[in-house]
Swiss-Prot record:
Lineage of origin: Bacteria, Pseudomonadati, Pseudomonadota, Alphaproteobacteria, Acetobacterales
Gene label: rpoB
The protein's name: DNA-directed RNA polymerase subunit beta
Reactions that this protein is recorded to catalyse: RNA(n) + a ribonucleoside 5'-triphosphate = RNA(n+1) + diphosphate
Tagged with keyword Nucleotidyltransferase: yes
InterPro entries the UniProt entry points to: DNA-dir_RNA_pol_bsu_ext_1_sf, DNA-dir_RNA_pol_bsu_external_1, DNA-dir_RNA_pol_su2, DNA-dir_RNAP_su2_dom, DNA-dir_RNAP_su2_hyb_sf, RNA_pol_bsu_bac, RNA_pol_bsu_CS, RNA_pol_bsu_protrusion
Any one biological process term the GO annotation gives: DNA-templated transcription
Top EC class of this enzyme: transferase
Annotated GO CC locations: DNA-directed RNA polymerase complex
Function: DNA-dependent RNA polymerase catalyzes the transcription of DNA into RNA using the four ribonucleoside triphosphates as substrates.
Length: 1400
């Protein structure tokens, strides 16, 4: 239970610079959880890195070690125990790992204890001989970065959480599909977390069978016979109390009587005498049995002989209860006994002979035998129309009759072909479900089982119990009898999330189990007295399991780093695919569909289009994953029709008991629900109830959708399919050089920017001390304003993301600014003033324009391209390696054979391109030469070689050249050298620059610390009496400001004072300062040492150079653009500004969109956004004019304030704006003069009336339409046009990446046809259908060219080239190489094919 905090609306440093007006009516009272906590919390719980070893919980890595250790050797002489583990400091930090292509990981040291026993050969008693304890290195454990990612081999990866079916017991039926009669065949399945599956099922004859691990089925009673009987359980308990154990021979299974007693009650039939003196049979009267039955004959009270109900009467429940008050037993005819089943073995009281076994049917003959033997009571099974004979019939059909038979039968099914013995059968059966090492239900499975079966059992009991199996079969029989409900496997109560920590735990367990076998074998093969723990351990299997998981698991994915939203969404993704999950092909509609329990947990909108639809989902905004892996969503509690000030996170199972109202249910200020009937959700249905029946209410309207869907304004006005496209396309928006935050937002922009890690967030409150383009230095201050330390934030400048977009951070603060903890101090890619900014606000008109916006094409103004509104920077990385080859070392050099000076103009003396050089396709980036093979030399060459020495002819040019289609500016070069290899001048220059940067950081931090230390020292010294010890200050002198001013600041620390307490405080201060300076120096030296040490390289590589090139991409025809409502299109034409349609005041529009794209797509949200954006922009312009007037004339201040009050409303104005200083007000107005930013939260946004009010305030037509003139003629269009500001994005599908043309290029080796694809610089495929087209036109020569000289006629290609060189135009086509391939293949089949080209 959580109380609602009042601090949700704290105004941050950036919020004051640009205030976003919200149209939301429902106050946000519940804090939204951090968006990437799913990842971080899971991995922290797995590693427990910052928890001391003795207080770690038994989960995650700790549990893996505890479950595998201790390991005993086969002889019982040695045991290896796990004591604790610790993670040391990682060798490189995150940035270094990305640069060097390393994995960000920490060495894992495990302390193991080896115990050696002395074993007495006669008695077998053991005594400890030796105990050895030692830390053992167990490989590196990858660490998670602060942003929830892993750096593996230099690239950032994300482990996607997996949805899978929860362990536990599930009941289902075949929906009548199996049997021709259409009757339901019920089944139950016990799914463990680890171990054998257990399936129970009815067959068409209504017998119950069991399958173990989907093997051949057995009658369920075979399994029941194999379970221990009551007598054995009692015996086991008695033995365990004495500390003894049971022998295998003493174990007895359940017998038929015990099985039947568990599943059926007993109905005793007794012999009685009637009033007439005749003998008859009577049975107890139970209202439940007779309820709803139609009587065949009169119902007679056995004691009084009175008729209590007439024949042909139908007994209602009420009548049956009334009869039961007076009547205990009723008479029955002999015919009622015939066909019933005996409940227990019946003996002849005289001879002891068995008349009937338990479960046997009573026939006429049997009944006569019972009567003749004088049996006065026959116990029968309580089988009637309400309870079917399913177990009894199965028992009758089962050929086994004892535990031994049953165990052997089970053994034969599990291990067919192996000869069973009673010992192996017993061991196998025990290992299947009752051995904690092989079977694990997990805590979740046990909790789910308890809930479904109505049992109470600790969640530490992870194996199956006899009670679980019996209760499962009992519930299945009840389902068959028509009582209870089957389970819905798509309910989120039955599906759970496996996050990073759990996936990693399973993987590490696999690695440790591989190790365990090796350790056991090694313990047996060495002299155990003389070894230490590390001699027994080979950590490679564990390290390999981890490496394999991060490198190649389906759930370890290359992070989508296009923009901050795509990062956040990727980390919040839930996949039903992956190991142990579903496959695309097998997943049906039900599992992909939206389920009522998804509400507030999984987004119903955001999922991929295509084969993965519904299998990959996104967490909803407020959702969390609980300790059992179930997704929870928060609800505010409601009591007696009043909303309380507390909220609670609930899973789908817990929500079943609640009646939940919508967040927008009308209520008073104190939370009282006002409507007579409230619309609520209960058990997945919608209904209307009275307010006092409501038990909970949604915390926010946006808790239903994911982060990406919550960023779409007017989502409620868009069709779901288009909203899905809108959510997915926002993730593809490339960061622009200058992004705008949307004028029409939803209020989610700031949380996404903050939690994504794209921006820099202040860790502690403080004052900005220094700032430049690459770093921010904050002098941290405590709560009381005293200096606490220094925080240096390094900005990421022009770094390449996984998708080659540009990561660049810009400071938002100035020197002297005060910032609080959690404030955003630097913007990153696609953020502006701490808010997500994926695109630009552009002036759009919905109208046709000469057919250029046919089929969703987009027409843009030249101004958009010229002012770089949609220009993005992409950073391409190129690398070259100098290897040690058999012929000698490759060399990176400027001295390249047969290359002119012009081609080397961008290279320095080391042969590496300069930073800042403008490069074009074909330019050399890094010069490299490779030794050539020794070819036989002529005598002349030998002579020349002897005279002139080694020549350049020994090497060939293998330089790194810029590939076609790329041109840009070199922004960074990194040189890596193998350890022990001499560094070239360029590598040394880069190293020097890096050391200077580190030294500057160290010096600045030291200076701030020293300043703080001296200030605190000064406070301590002032007013004190000086002691002896400092030359120039007499003992007994009072220390004043003037005295301190005369002494150099550095010498203050040498002063002493007579007050011992103060002197002790000064000594402590000095010690703390010296320690922090020492730590600083150590950190600096370790970083420098790493820089100078040289790099770890792949085998055979001596040197590696990486060149990063920034490519500037302007918006051009062929680029894909989109809005946030699924309205996507391709730029068709860039029109000169003067030709664009313009408004009455002469403003040309930026973008023209097709109005036909709206009605059929049903995404009307884009129109509402356009109207509201138009109002925002015009209000901003008015505020801008008012600010200019105020700057000219101070008297205009009141008008400006009145305008701001009118726009933002009284509450925000009084809270935030009224108290602003002049400079703050000017900054605010400067930031909103392009448009007043507004938030229209999803499902709680601006109404039509709000939009009309805004348009009216801005002095615009409330229709939102304007008169527009044609830019070419200047004439007005005949009707008004919808014009306004829409937020447009440029998507990652750019024409530059796709367009491609080939002149000459590589050919396939066998077919000699050109390769395909842009990456191979391939040709265009001229396929079968294209051939048909040329055939249809009769273009014979063109067709011949296409199939021969332009494709795979090798000699013909050469002749064409020669003809072109000679400036001739005659050539002849030969035989295509593919024809030769065909003849060769026919020959390989033994068919000799000869091509006879002679002309008769």
């Amino acid at each position: 239970m959580n109380a609602i905090s009042g601090g949700l609306n704290k105004v941050s440093f950036t919020n004051r610079k640009r205030i976003r007006k919200s149209f939301g009516r429902i106050p946000e009272t519940t804090p939204m959880p951090n968006l990437i906590d799913v990842q971080r919390a899971s991995y922290d719980a797995f590693l427990q890195m910052h928890v001391s070893p003795d207080s770690r919980t038994n989960s995650g890595l700790q549990e893996v070690f505890k479950s595998v250790f201790p390991i005993d050797d086969f002889a019982g002489r040695g045991r290896l125990e796990f004591v604790y583990y610790e993670l040391e400091e990682p060798k490189y930090d995150v940035e270094e790992c990305i640069q060097r292509g390393m994995t960000y990981a920490a060495p894992l040291k495990v302390v193991l204890r080896l115990i050696v026993w002395d074993v007495d050969e006669d008695t077998g008693a053991r005594s400890i001989r030796d105990i050895k304890e030692q830390p053992v290195y167990m490989g590196d454990m990858p660490l998670m970065t602060d942003n929830g990612t892993f750096v593996v081999n230099g690239t950032e990866r994300v482990i996607v959480s997996q949805m899978h079916r929860s362990p536990g017991v599930f009941f289902d039926h075949d929906k009548g599909k199996t049997h021709s009669s259409g009757k339901y065949l019920f089944a139950a399945r016990v799914i463990p977390y680890r171990g054998s599956w257990l399936d129970f099922e009815f067959d068409a004859k209504d017998l119950i069978y069991v399958r173990i691990d989907r093997k051949r089925k057995l009658p369920v009673t075979t399994l029941l016979y194999a379970l221990e009987g009551r007598a054995t359980e009692a015996l086991r308990a008695a033995r365990e109390a004495k500390g003894e154990s049971l022998e295998i021979g003493e174990i007895r299974g359940m017998d038929a009587e015990e099985i039947l007693t568990y599943f059926y009650g007993k109905v005793p039939f007794t012999r009685t005498r009637t009033r007439d003196g005749e003998t008859a049979w009577a049975r107890p009267f139970e209202p439940e049995t007779f309820r709803g039955a139609k009587l065949v004959e009169d119902l007679v009270d056995a004691e009084t002989g009175e008729v209590v109900a007439k024949a042909d009467d139908k007994l209602t429940a009420r009548v049956a209860r009334q009869i039961a008050v007076k009547t205990r037993t009723v008479l029955v005819s002999r015919a009622d006994l015939i066909g019933r089943y005996v409940a227990e073995d019946l003996f002849d009281p005289n001879t002891g002979e068995i008349f009937a076994d338990a479960g046997e049917e009573i026939s006429e003959a049997k009944l006569k035998t019972f009567e003749d033997a004088g049996l006065d009571e026959i116990p029968t099974l309580a089988i009637d129309q309400a309870k079917g004979p399913w177990i009894r019939n199965t028992l009758a059909a089962d050929k086994n009759a004892s535990r031994e038979d049953a165990l052997i039968d089970i053994y034969r099914v599990i291990r067919p072909g192996e000869p069973p013995t009673s010992e192996t059968a017993e061991a196998l059966f025990r290992g299947l479900f009752f051995d904690a090492e092989r079977y694990d239900l997990s805590a979740v499975g046990r909790v789910k089982m308890n809930m479904r079966l109505g049992l109470e059992c600790e969640d530490t009991v992870r194996v199956l119990r006899k009670e679980d199996i019996l209760r499962t079969i009992q519930i299945m029989c009840e389902l068959k009898d028509g009582r209870g409900q089957v389970d819905d496997i798509d309910n989120l109560g039955n599906r759970r999330v496996r996050s990073v920590g759990e996936l990693m735990e399973n993987q590490y367990r696999i690695g440790l189990l591989r190790m365990e076998r090796a350790i056991r074998e090694r313990m047996g093969s060495v002299d155990i007295d003389g070894v230490m723990p590390h001699d027994l351990i080979n950590a490679k299997p564990a390290a390999a399991a981890v490496r394999e998981f991060f490198g190649s698991s389906q759930l370890s994915q290359f992070m989508d780093q296009t923009n901050p939203l795509s990062e956040v969404t990727h980390k919040r993704r839930l996949s039903a695919l992956g190991p142990g999950g579903l496959t695309r092909e097998r997943a049906g509609f039900e599992v992909r569909d939206v389920h009522p329990t998804h509400y507030g947990r999984i987004c119903p909108i955001e999922t991929p289009e295509g084969p993965n639809i519904g299998l990959i989902n996104s967490l909803a905004t407020f959702a969390k994953v609980n300790k059992y892996g179930f997704i929870e969503t928060p609800y505010r509690l409601v009591k007696d029709g009043k909303v309380l000030d507390e909220y609670k996170y609930l899973s789908a199972m817990e929500e079943e008991r609640l009646t939940v109202a919508q967040a927008d249910a009308p209520k008073l200020a104190d939370g009282t629900l006002t409507e007579d009937l409230v619309s609520v959700r209960r058990n997945g249905d919608f209904r209307l109830v009275k307010p006092d029946e409501v038990t909970a209410i949604d915390v926010s309207p946006r808790q239903l959708v994911s982060v990406a869907a919550a960023l779409i304004p007017f989502l409620e006005n868009d069709d779901a399919n288009r909203a899905l496209m809108g959510s997915n396309m926002q993730r593809q928006a490339v960061p622009l050089i200058k992004s705008d935050a949307p004028l029409v937002g939803t209020g989610m922009e700031a949380p996404v920017a903050r939690d994504s890690g794209a921006t820099i967030v202040a860790r502690r409150a403080g004052v900005i001390d220094q700032i430049d383009g690459a770093r921010i230095v904050v002098r941290a201050t405590g709560e009381d304003g005293t200096t606490q330390g220094v925080d240096i934030y390094r900005l990421r400048k022009f770094m390449r993301s996984n998708q080659s977009t540009c990561i660049n951070q810009r400071p938002l603060v100035r020197v002297g600014d005060r910032v609080g903890a959690g404030d955003i101090i630097a913007d990153g890619p696609s953020t502006e003033l701490g808010e997500l900014a994926l695109g630009r606000n552009v002036l759009c008109a919905f109208m046709p324009w000469n057919g250029y916006n046919f089929e969703d094409s987009i027409l843009i103004s030249e101004r958009v391209a010229r002012e770089d509104m949609f220009t993005s920077i992409h950073i391409e990385e190129f690398e070259v390696m100098a290897r040690d080859t058999k012929l000698g070392q490759e060399e990176i050099t400027r001295d390249i054979p047969n290359v002119g000076e012009e081609a080397l103009r961008n290279l320095d003396e080391a042969g590496i391109v300069y930073i800042g050089a403008e490069v074009n396709p074909g330019d050399i980036l890094v010069g490299k030469v490779t030794p050539k093979g020794e070819s036989p030399m002529t005598p002349e060459e030998k002579l020349l070689r002897a005279i002139f020495g080694e020549k350049a002819s020994d090497v060939r040019d293998t330089s790194l050249k810029l590939p076609p289609g790329v041109n840009g500016t070199v922004v960074d070069v990194r040189v890596f050298n193998r350890r022990g290899v001499d560094k070239d001048e360029r590598a040394l220059a880069i190293e020097r620059a890096e050391i200077e940067r580190l030294a500057k950081d160290r010096d600045d931090e030291r200076a701030i610390q020293e300043r703080a230390f001296l200030n605190r020292l000064r406070e301590k010294l002032l007013g004190q009496v000086a002691g002896s010890g400092y030359k120039g200050v007499r003992s007994g002198t009072e220390i004043t400001t003037e005295l301190l001013a005369e002494i150099p600041r550095g010498a203050w620390r040498n002063l002493t004072v007579q007050d011992d307490r103060v002197m002790a405080e000064i000594e402590t201060l000095k010690r703390e300062f010296d320690a922090s300076v020492h730590k600083l120096q150590q950190r600096f030296e370790s970083k420098v040492e790493k820089l100078q040490r040289g790099d770890e390289m792949p085998p055979g590589v001596m040197k590696m150079v990486k060149v990063f090139i920034a490519v500037k991409r302007k918006l051009q025809p062929g680029d894909k653009m989109a809005g946030r409502h699924g309205n996507k299109g391709v730029v068709s034409k860039v029109v000169p500004i003067e030709d664009m349609p313009f408004l009455e005041d002469g403003t040309p529009v930026d973008v023209v969109l097709n109005p036909l794209g709206v009605p059929s797509r049903m995404n009307v949200g884009q129109i509402l956004e356009t109207h509201l954006g138009w109002a925002c922009a015009n209000l901003g312009r008015q505020i801008g004019e008012a600010v200019e007037a105020y700057q000219r004339d101070v008297a205009e201040r009141e008008r400006l304030h009145a305008m701001l009050k009118s726009v933002y409303g009284e509450e925000i104005y009084n809270e935030q704006i009224a108290s602003m200083s002049d400079a703050e007000l000017r900054e605010l107005c400067g930031n909103i003069r392009k448009g007043v930013p507004i938030a229209t939260p999803v499902f709680d946004g601006a109404r039509i009336t709000d939009i009309e009010d805004m348009l009216a305030k801005a002095g615009l037509d409330v229709s939102g339409q304007m008169t527009v003139c044609d830019g070419r003629t200047g004439e007005q269009f005949e009707r008004k046009v919808t014009v306004g500001y829409m937020y447009m994005l440029k998507l990652g599908h750019m024409v530059d990446d796709k367009i491609h043309a080939r002149s000459i290029g590589p050919y396939s080796l066998v077919t000699q046809q050109p390769l395909g694809g842009k990456a191979q610089f391939g040709g265009q495929r001229f396929g079968e259908m294209e051939v048909w087209a040329l055939e249809a036109y009769g273009a014979a020569y063109t067709l011949q060219e296409m199939l021969t000289v332009k494709s795979d006629d090798v000699s013909g290609r050469t002749k064409v080239y020669e003809a072109i060189v000679r400036e001739q135009d005659n050539f002849e086509a030969g035989v295509p190489e593919s024809f030769n391939v065909l003849t060769k293949e026919l020959k390989s089949l033994g068919l000799n094919v000869d091509l006879n080209l002679s002309v008769d």
